């Protein structure tokens, strides 16, 4: 979708002209403000007044445009999204050097308007400074206490697998969309850690909460919201912004009901989940008279939202990619099931089995690599002026560590655009780790739920492949399963249906 089409679709002529005049003033002010002390800037395409390089971008898949631009401008280049300068980092070595070796300088989070309306710089994912440090530290500590990535989580996942199988069985081997049952199952894992209990898949409070969160993730990455992030004064006339705001209002109301229910039965000697721990800390700070505490209602609401969304959408999306890829490539599914049958037999898979299932583990990793569900990462921001690989990048500059360029770096992967599990196998068929495998990002902003996500993917995937043969519907060939995906904040599989055929 072109920029002009996006603007005309959502704005009146008067509003558009007013916005353009405001942009012109900003552009003229900013164009003359560059300090002579600044060093060489990264190269990039010449921007147009007001629009910057927007006419160059495919707004539905901007990461593809960035990847193409790197062929002309190198692994570090800049583009202007309207008046906003954005530095793009491309390739494994460049991204790793920035996020790991220069973690402090590239460690802040850019909070775009579409995310600011959700959190106002509270919570874990979209906050900075001491608030971010305190919330992340508290979340990591308490999630570990409640078994995230450990034995406690394993038991919760194995229990949830049985509920998910029950849902699959209801379709009686007929074609169905895996989206909702998979998302509900994965959401229940984080719900049990955050709230201390799971929900029934028929509970409207739960299903509406999950569906709204998934819709916000999808809509937030739309072309119109990208335009909103650049020209936020267009917000009042954007349909997708209204959808996001409405979902936020309803989700907050439901969340407060759940939190208040936990508050009424709160027992400091018996913490049920993350919310209990936060409420206890909040009460302790209030009783001690601590001023400027970070443990307040807004941080609680947004931390729960962050954990819920991050713990649901990415894992659920990756698992659905994995099932679709098995239907598309039945010969790979054959090898996975042969290995599971030979090593596991009919018993329940456990995390310790991972090292005994090298091919299956390779398939899961290759699914994460090829699915590439967060291709642009979440945007970073420089915390200070920095000279990086000879280029000067000013404090407060938006930085995009292009994860798609890491996971598909041709210098790191033999077949970057193909589904090739051998990327993770040595010549003897044993699993090997790859440094360029970076689906959870890296550095200070690395996904704090990586351990839980890895456990969920392994247990859900192996258990489902142990129980079912996944096929395309009758009359549909594997070639018709599109690998391009649907782009939001994450990249979901294109709409499709699968048949879950029970294995004897």
Q: What residue ranges belong to the model's regions?
A:
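C-terminal helix/juxtamembrane-tail motif
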Residues: 1-11, 20-24, 277-280, 398, ...
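Conserved cytochrome P450 K-helix E-x-x-R motif and the immediately C-terminal K′/meander segment
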Residues: 54-74, 253, 347-390, 410, ...
